[in-house]
Amino acid sequence: DHIPPEKNLVWKAAKLLQERCHITDGIDIYLEKNIPAAAGLAGGSSDCAAALIGINELCGLGLTLGQLCDLGVTLGADVPFCLQKGTMLSEGIGEILTRLPDLSPLWVLLIKPDISVSTGYVYTHLKLDEITSHPDTEHLIDCIRRHDDATLARGLSNVLETVTIPEYPILAELKRFLSDNGAIGSLMSGSGPTTYGLYQDES
């Protein structure tokens, strides 16, 4: 409700396809957002991906998944990932994707506090030279292949927490709450503020 249409990624996706593919017909788009904005859940990127796929099919453009990804990354770093299904290793700014084995079925509990976090602000204030701990990507991939969920969950980390959590200490409290209540791992999602816990069973 607070995003002008011309700044919405769905509008940008439609405009991009219109210009690149010389679409002359009009398209009516109704957007119902179920993922909160500025929540760290890639809601805008997933909407953008859906728009690219939908318009490609609706207008019979015949663009391949690779072509859609090439267009999508110009709109948002997460868009190529949202265009594809399954577990991926994402490198570069998000445009280099390597498919991984499916994760084991896990329960995920999301907590979205009444806070909105600007992704741009977080990346602008991220000090890469001060980050001393990085996730062991190869080890985590090995855990995925072996379905070692507990070790995988313990090894997860998010460097963006170094910016968002000092601004909103309640996120550290939420992580502790989730861990204290049975989560095998808890982490901030994306640039925040949504925090999630991973559980091996529903109870």
Could you tell me what each predicted segment is?
Residues 1-27, 38:
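N-terminal beta-alpha supersecondary unit
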Residues 10, 39-65, 81:
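DPxDG-like acidic metal-binding loop motif
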Residues 19-28, 54-74, 201-203:
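Phosphate-handling active-site elements
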Residues 27-40, 182-186:
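Short pre-catalytic strand/loop immediately N-terminal to key active-site residues, enriched for Gly-Thr
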Residues 43-44, 188-193:
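Glycine-rich beta-strand-to-loop/alpha-helix junction loops that act as flexible
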Residues 60-101:
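Glycine/threonine-rich beta-strand-loop-alpha-helix active-site module
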Residues 84, 89-185, 200-202:
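Conserved, helical-rich catalytic subdomain that frames metal- and/or nucleotide-binding sites
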Residues 196-198:
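Short hydrophobic/aromatic beta-strand micro-patches
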